Amino acid sequence: MNVKFFCGKSAKIEVMKDKIRILHINDLHSHFEQYPQLKRAVDDLSQTDRELIKVDLGDNVDKSHPLSDATAGRFNIALMNELGIDYATIGNNEGIGLAKDELDCLYEQAQFQPIIGNLKDEEGQPEWAKPYLVHKTKAGTKIAFLAYTFPYYLTYAPNGWQVLDPMARLEEDLARSEVMDADLVIVLSHLGVRYDEQISETYPQVNLVIGSHTHHLFEEGKLINETYLAAADRYGYFLGCIDLTVENGQIIACQIEAIPTKDYILDLDKEDEAFIKAMREEGHRRLAQEKVANLGRKLNFNETCQLVLQAVCQET
């Protein structure tokens, strides 16, 4: 706690308020056509005297975009670095949409810290992620970040992962001495709105749940009991902005907004159009260089589906 002393007839103690801004992105799903205005929104809202923390809630990577497919998500990581993300968790698109070896090396060039508390392999916690993290602000506020992804038990297992019950893991994490010693507990949730509401109703220790997965939107946040909830839709249509004011380790003010990124579209911006076109063309160019098989002729739709199903059966 920072205090100021004023000498005179009586000493006055002024408690310094810790002002924090959290910007959050979720479920981009490689909609890179949204990136130019999303980047401008992040840059604009980063101009603040508050301490700034930027987080991504998962499902950033989606192989539906050819450049994400061709780079196994590494291009997404480069853009996240450019946005200045500090912490990120994973969604099912990273956990299931990528092969295990792809996910294991996805964050090699990341300039941010991945966090995931309910995923492990046969060796335990993934090397590329922390199970939780305590962030200490310049003013001394300790924020415990916990993170969980939706437990698709049957689909994680064939990929070499064990996904754990997020509520059980949350309860265990809340009992950790380092988490109990924190001033604030924030959950980075890729669980969906029902889980988020359950967390808020069950665990008063959690101060804030930043949500994703179900693509829900809380334009001005939500409060359940003493827990705040935030969520910013999908595809980069919104940028979440949370302004916290903390005094003596307690939240005394919380403003939650979902800012429409369409407000940051520049009319007839040729650079944006060129950027979007170039990313798609580069993805197609790289994919065209990857030879999978020599078929002799082009397969029709039914033949392609049959081939895919046969491959799935072989692997399972």
What is each stretch, according to the model?
Residues K4-F5, Q111, A274:
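Intrinsic disorder/low-structure terminal segments
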Residues V246-T316:
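A short C-terminal boundary segment appended to hydrolase-like catalytic domains
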Residues K12-T261, C305, A311:
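Acidic, metal/ion-coordinating pockets
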Residues K4-K12:
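Short, positively charged and aromatic/hydrophobic N-terminal segments
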